[in-house]
Amino acid sequence: SEVPILTTKKLAWKTAIKELLWIWQLKSNDVNDLNKMSVHIWDQWKQEDGTIGHAYGFQLGKKNRSLNGEKVDQVDYLLHQLKNNPSSRRHITMLWNPDELDAMALTPCVYETQWYVKHGKLHLEVRARSNDMALGNPFNVFQYNVLQRMIAQVTGYELGEYIFNIGDCHVYTRHIDNLKIQMEREQFEAPELWINPEVKDFYDFTIDDFKLINYKHGDKLLFEVRV
């Protein structure tokens, strides 16, 4: 049950999970929804209408998949197919919509997931077009492993392999000094993530259903966000 999270600095892991819930559970593009969770990491991209445009949760919430004669969104379709058609090679979600890229405040960094069920285990491969190694990468790698655990739990599978692919990993010049400090720090054993085993519906998870056990980490390091 080890979780891939940085130990050389403190990661705001609850903030990361709240952002995950905002995108995947609420399927929201409304920054005000995130603000209600006391999270402000998207404030810089907030548009006049309070949203980030047609990005992230907006794409997951579009009812563009057909299921039993009805239109459903990507998340509901994925959950249904994993339970009812586990051997499919089409367990994919996609945030990269070429028709709507110009309507997004920020084009998605993590844009695709592909899920595999083998021998009773749920495997996940994530694809990111771009990852800021100081800020975005630690959040994203942790978040999508949490997502894998959540979906494995509600679909009845054991946890399988987790693969995170990055097209362009980059370091901004202004982050170099603090990253050098971070690289010299002691690393600690990975903590364990507890997820409330009573939750059986993906939409019932709340932030209170997650606990990091024995999370030892270095001091906080500040990195400027690029807008």
Swiss-Prot record:
PROSITE patterns: THYMIDYLATE_SYNTHASE (PS00091). It catalyses: dUMP + (6R)-5,10-methylene-5,6,7,8-tetrahydrofolate = 7,8-dihydrofolate + dTMP. Homodimer. HAMAP family: Thymidy_synth_bact (MF_00008). It comes from Bacillus atrophaeus. Keywords: Cytoplasm, Methyltransferase, Nucleotide biosynthesis, Transferase. GO terms for molecular function: thymidylate synthase activity. The keyword Transmembrane does not apply. SUPFAM superfamilies: Thymidylate synthase/dCMP hydroxymethylase. DUMP binds at residues 89-90, 129-132, 140, 170-172. One of its GO terms (biological process) is dTTP biosynthetic process. This is Thymidylate synthase. Belongs to the thymidylate synthase family. Bacterial-type ThyA subfamily. Its main location: cytoplasm.
